[in-house]
Regions:
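Conserved N-terminal phosphate-binding loop of PLP-dependent enzymes in the Aspartate aminotransferase
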Residues: 1-117
Length: 117
């Protein structure tokens, strides 16, 4: 509509709030998306994903994408293992995390009421 590229930084939110990141929760489809160590369970990795027409610019060497360890084995193995775990049993890990999160939040609310905070 506006002829601009919409980029979404998912370095903090990617894979932490949902397997599809904040973009899934918010119902947004960016043209480009950045992700960080959550995709590899803390192993130093970063990545960029996006729509085919934009990613084709990278694939065709029209855009230089430098990096410290681009595509290194340990990082890529960590990504695959992390994604396997996060998607196991219909993403059950997220349901468990949200259940625990709700208990923690309920406890914090109770404490804040008790001490009039």
């Amino acid at each position: 509509m506006y002829n601009i590229v919409m980029c979404m930084d998912e370095v903090i939110t990617g894979f932490r709030v949902n397997i599809g990141g904040a973009q899934t929760v918010l119902g947004v489809t960016p043209d480009l998306c950045t992700m960080g160590k959550a995709i590899s369970n803390g192993i130093p990795v970063s990545c960029v994903g996006g729509k085919k027409e934009i990613m084709d610019c990278i694939r065709g060497n029209k855009v230089l994408v430098p990096g410290t360890y681009p595509g290194y084995g340990l990082g890529m193995a960590a990504v695959l293992a992390t994604l396997d775990e996060l998607t196991k049993d219909d993403c059950a890990v997220y349901k468990q995390v949200f259940k625990v999160q709700e208990k923690i939040m309920d406890g914090l609310v109770e404490i804040s009421r008790k001490y009039d905070i």
